[in-house]
């Protein structure tokens, strides 16, 4: 039996929140991008059954989860990789909620960050098969239902490879699913 460290407990809590994460994401968030240290500790957590691991094939990374393997692994992985990239860029992540219901809208995730000592809030939508439905967010803004949870309407981050339509009434930041254009987010912060 191994003794759980505060970092181990934070890893388990993170996996409970986002459902699934790969080795590189957990490395970026909890191990200061030290891959070998993260692999060894994650293996110990798997061996002692604190977390579970899955690998699609021999050359892919391990994918970690706590309870049972999610049905939409790719969708959940994109969201957790996005959070890992924020940590890698040195952006302070204050709060994460996956998913979050605001009024009639169920966003894939909510994230509160601090960048240049300025707090920002975002609703996250991961669209790997369909297009972003901006109508539900326009309705959320017009009915002011977001006021029950937030002081201002959060910006929307849409992670998708599709050519989604924009709406001038909303503040939407588009990112690709491989997150190769994450600098777009930093430029708009």
Task: Describe the function of each predicted region.
Residues 18-21, 129, 163-164:
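Short, solvent-exposed loop/turn segments at secondary-structure junctions
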Residues 123, 155-158:
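Structural beta-sheet core signal
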Residues 30, 42, 46, 82, ...:
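Hydrophobic, Leu/Ile/Phe/Ala-enriched alpha-helical segments that form helix-helix packing faces
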Residues 70-71, 85-122, 128-132:
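Active-site metal-binding core of divalent-cation-utilizing nuclease and nuclease-like domains
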Residues 132-153:
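Basic, amphipathic alpha-helical patches used to engage nucleic acids or provide basic targeting signals
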Residues 157-189:
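Domain-level recognition of nuclease-like catalytic cores that cleave nucleotide substrates
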Residues 1-69:
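Nuclease-adjacent, charged terminal/linker segments that flank catalytic cores
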Residues 69-83:
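A broadly used, surface-exposed interaction patch
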């Amino acid at each position: 039996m191994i003794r759980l460290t505060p970092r181990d407990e934070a890893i388990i809590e993170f996996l409970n929140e986002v459902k699934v994460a790969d080795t590189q994401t957990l490395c970026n968030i909890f191990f200061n991008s030290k891959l070998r240290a993260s692999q060894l500790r994650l293996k110990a957590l798997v061996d002692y059954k604190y977390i579970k691991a899955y690998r699609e094939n021999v050359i892919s990374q391990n994918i970690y989860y706590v309870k049972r393997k999610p049905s939409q692994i790719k969708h959940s992985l994109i969201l957790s990789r996005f959070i890992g990239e924020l940590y890698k860029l040195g952006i302070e992540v204050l709060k994460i909620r996956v998913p979050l219901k605001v009024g009639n809208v169920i966003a894939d995730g909510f994230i509160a960050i601090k960048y240049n000592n300025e707090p920002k809030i975002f609703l996250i939508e991961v669209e790997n098969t369909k297009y972003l439905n901006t109508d539900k967010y326009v309705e959320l803004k017009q009915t002011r239902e977001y006021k029950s949870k937030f002081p201002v309407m959060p910006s929307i981050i849409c992670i998708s490879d599709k050519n989604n339509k924009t709406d001038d009434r909303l503040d939407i930041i588009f990112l690709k699913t491989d997150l190769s254009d994450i600098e777009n987010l930093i430029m708009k912060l």
